[in-house]
């Protein structure tokens, strides 16, 4: 498994914990909103910043997509 994928799994699990939600449900939501790949591709930025900042960014990404739907 690549470092990028390991971090993505870690991020997904920590984000789900932060949201008091199941990781499977979070991933399904991201897939539905078509943001999973975008979040995965943000590895370079996300792995060097505070995890809370990453969570806030993911919240914004999801909110923007929900507004468009």
Predicted regions and their residues:
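Amphipathic, hydrophobic secondary-structure cores in small proteins
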Residues: 16, 23-46
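Long, compositionally biased
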Residues: 43-69
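Intrinsic disorder/low-structure terminal segments
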Residues: 6-7, 39, 54
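N-terminal acidic leader/helix
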Residues: 1-26
């Amino acid at each position: 498994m690549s470092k990028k994928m390991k971090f993505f799994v870690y991020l997904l699990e920590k984000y789900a914990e932060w949201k008091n939600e199941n990781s499977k449900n979070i991933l399904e939501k991201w897939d539905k909103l078509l943001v999973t790949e975008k979040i995965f591709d943000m590895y370079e930025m996300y792995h060097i910043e505070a995890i809370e900042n990453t969570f806030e960014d993911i919240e914004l990404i999801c909110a923007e997509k929900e507004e468009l739907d």
